[in-house]
Regions:
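Regulatory sensory and allosteric helical modules in signal-transduction proteins
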Residues: 103-147, 167
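Helix-loop-beta substructure at the N-terminus of cytosolic sensory domains
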Residues: 63-102
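Signal-transmission linkers at sensory-effector interfaces
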Residues: 14-60
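A short, aliphatic-rich beta-strand micro-motif
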Residues: 144-157
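Regulatory loop-to-helix N-cap segments in sensory/regulatory domains
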Residues: 157, 169-177
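Short, positively charged
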Residues: 1-10
Length: 177
């Protein structure tokens, strides 16, 4: 009885048997699953590449002998390994020997309060945030998109005040969107 049932095909006005329709539905389902598997493999490859870069970056940071050189190592590692065109870091409330270092200069009380108010990294357009001014402009192009990462002890969403801010920028308005 079921072999004689005819159903209209979604790919035309012709009638097809129930078995043909079920086989067609299974082919479509398999095709969808294949796409999902390809996406998972692609994501896995991306994750492996990111893990390798993070490992290279942290290894380079561990090789820094002088704490004075650490902020520059953080910034240069991010720019080179992660292809971030613009990056800067500022820290405040530092020990005496570091008080005049470049990485401790230029953070106003407003910028410090703003960094402390961030309970998660900000990613989006450059809306004229003061920390965007800390970035060196590559080829005269100002940052159109930013990632602002507060530096604090403990979890990023803790009530602990930030002791610094890592700023990533790009002339591409969608890079950190």
């Amino acid at each position: 009885v079921l072999a004689s049932v005819q159903i209209t095909s979604p790919h035309g006005q012709r009638a097809v048997s129930l078995q043909e329709r079920q086989a067609e539905m299974l082919r479509e389902k398999i095709k969808g699953l294949e796409h999902r598997i390809m996406d998972m493999v692609r994501n896995s490859n991306d994750n492996t590449a990111i893990a390798t870069k993070v490992h290279q970056w942290t290894s380079a940071l561990l090789r820094v002998k002088d704490p004075f050189d650490l902020p520059e190592a953080v910034v240069s590692g991010i720019r080179t390994l992660f292809d971030v065109p613009q990056a800067a870091v500022r820290v405040w409330t530092v020990a005496g020997p570091y008080i005049d270092a470049d990485f401790t200069q230029g953070a106003s009380e407003d910028a410090r309060a703003f960094a402390s108010s961030l309970t998660m990294p900000f990613c989006g357009p450059n809306l004229g945030f003061e920390p965007a001014g800390w970035l060196a402009q590559e080829a005269g192009e100002p940052a159109q998109s930013l990632a602002l990462l507060p530096l604090r002890e403990g979890a990023i969403d803790s009530a602990t005040p930030a002791f610094g801010l890592l700023v990533l920028g790009s002339p591409d308005p969608l890079r950190f969107d």
